[in-house]
Design a protein with these regions (language model features):
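4′-phosphopantetheine-dependent carrier domains
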Residues: 19-20, 25-27, 46-52, 72
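A short glycine-rich, Lys/Arg-flanked "PGG" loop and its adjoining helix->strand segment in the class I
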Residues: 176-188
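A short acidic, Gly/Pro-enriched loop at the edge of an enzyme's catalytic core
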Residues: 149-161
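Class I (Rossmann-like) S-adenosyl-L-methionine-dependent methyltransferase catalytic domain
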Residues: 65-67, 77-152, 191-248
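A short SAM/SAH-binding and catalytic strip from SAM-dependent methyltransferases
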Residues: 160-173
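Phosphopantetheinylated carrier protein domains
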Residues: 42-67
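Short, surface-exposed beta-strand segments enriched in small/polar/acidic residues
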Residues: 23-38
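Thiotemplate assembly-line natural product biosynthesis machinery
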Residues: 1-27
Length: 248
């Protein structure tokens, strides 16, 4: 769950419920609290919704304001991510030291039968790397407009997997489940190429929660998934680049 959006929702609920009669409600707000149990008046509830959507620049978004706080936070996260990654995020492939076009040669050295680009964006590597499949839930230039969690059910293995700034958001557990699904799809002897931007907040994406990747985190994941952390580099902008290799 996106902790930034969760905090925003809680703070706005506390403002909307800032009356003595709601003291018991506000003191017990948590992600499993349901809107139906709050007893908030229709006028205050409508104002709360308007404030959230205006703050997040999602005025036209349709949200089901019912059920748990967590379910509403997840809806807001999906709507905001769709807008941000589909309309705002414009990567400049040429500027990345280790995972720009230089990555093409690294992948080709493997002579891969199949390559998966996770969070491919505009699918820029499609024409440069043979046998590449690009997936991205937010961009219709991808081969399949799905998340890695959905795509992991396919009966297919890839000799190389690219994840450039895509497995980089929300909590440690969110990272873990996505990495686990990538690992399931990676063929024996294959490699996963990562770029992550720990703590680098996009100026136009204040509600995107960036995960704090580090060497220690990458090392621990390699150990957990029985992979080799083959390479770990960092550029002058604190972006981190690393390669996981699966034993043959």
């Amino acid at each position: 769950m996106n902790s930034k959006i969760y905090k925003l929702v809680i703070e706005n609920l506390e403002d909307a419920l800032n009356l003595p009669k709601y003291d018991n409600v506000t003191s017990n707000l948590n992600e499993q609290t349901t809107f139906e149990d709050m007893g908030i008046t229709p006028v205050k509830f409508e104002k709360f919704q308007e404030d959230i959507l205006e703050t997040m620049s999602l005025k036209s978004a349709r949200i089901r304001w019912e059920g748990t706080i967590a379910s509403v936070v997840d809806q807001l996260d999906i709507k905001y991510s769709t807008m941000f990654f589909g309309e705002i995020w414009k990567p400049i492939t040429e500027k990345y030291s280790y995972t720009g076009w230089a990555l093409v040669d690294e992948v080709k050295k493997l002579n891969p039968r199949a390559v998966l680009d996770v969070g491919c964006g505009y699918n820029q590597f499609k024409e440069r790397i043979p046998n590449l499949t690009g997936i991205d839930p937010y961009n219709n230039m991808s081969d399949y407009q799905v998340d890695i969690l959905e795509y992991a059910n396919v009966d297919e293995h890839f000799d190389a997997i690219i994840a450039l700034g895509s497995i980089n958001f929300n909590s440690l557990e969110d990272i873990r489940v996505r990495l686990a699904n990538c690992n399931k799809l990676l063929a024996k002897g294959g490699k996963m190429f990562f770029r992550v931007n720990p703590g680098i907040q996009h100026k136009n994406g204040p509600w995107v929660e960036v995960f704090e990747w580090s060497f220690e985190v990458a090392h621990n994941f390699a150990k957990e998934f029985e992979l080799e952390l083959e390479t770990f580099k960092q550029d002058s902008n604190d972006r981190k680049y690393f390669v996981f290799a699966k034993p043959a």
